[in-house]
From Swiss-Prot:
Belongs to the RimM family. An accessory protein needed during the final step in the assembly of 30S ribosomal subunit, possibly for assembly of the head region. Essential for efficient processing of 16S rRNA. May be needed both before and after RbfA during the maturation of 16S rRNA. It has affinity for free ribosomal 30S subunits but not for 70S ribosomes. The gene is rimM. This is Ribosome maturation factor RimM. It comes from the Bacteria. It holds the Pfam family PRC_RimM.
Amino acid sequence: MQQWLEIGKVVAAQGLRGEVRVQPATDFAERLTRPGARLVGRSLDDGRVFRLQSGRAIPGKDLFVCRFEGVEERNAAEKLVGSTLWIGAAERPVLAAGEFWLPDLMGVRVFRQDTGEAIGEVSDMTRAGNDLLVIRLSGGKTVMVPFVHALVPVVDLEAGRIEVVAIPGLLDPEAAEADEA
């Protein structure tokens, strides 16, 4: 079964010739500019495959203008507003060593490197100065750990294991709550 990755949302029709404005949900602009198959729909179940003919960034805005085969006029484009765009997972660019796809990290078990104790699992990632892994601890609370090699030296996706260096306060949700107060 084909796996799909979300790459954007159709937010508006653009002009009279069937183009749409897309809010990107990807760091790879070529996913919205390079021709090829894209799944477009309100959900994966009702999505329809369209061929992206062309796409371009709108200077100064976090938007792209895309043209799909078979969408030739504004009324057809307006029917796509609110839809999500997906690309086949097999079309993901090759990453350098030490780089990972967020969907591949989700749900991976996290362990303290010093004791080997399982402490929780990755539930999300957020961006600040650098990426922060959001780890749902076994007790239900969450902590954020900078996703840098010094603190997260082991990421073994095949084994489903991430190891974290437990410096004082890093894995203590109460310390994080005290900092927020």
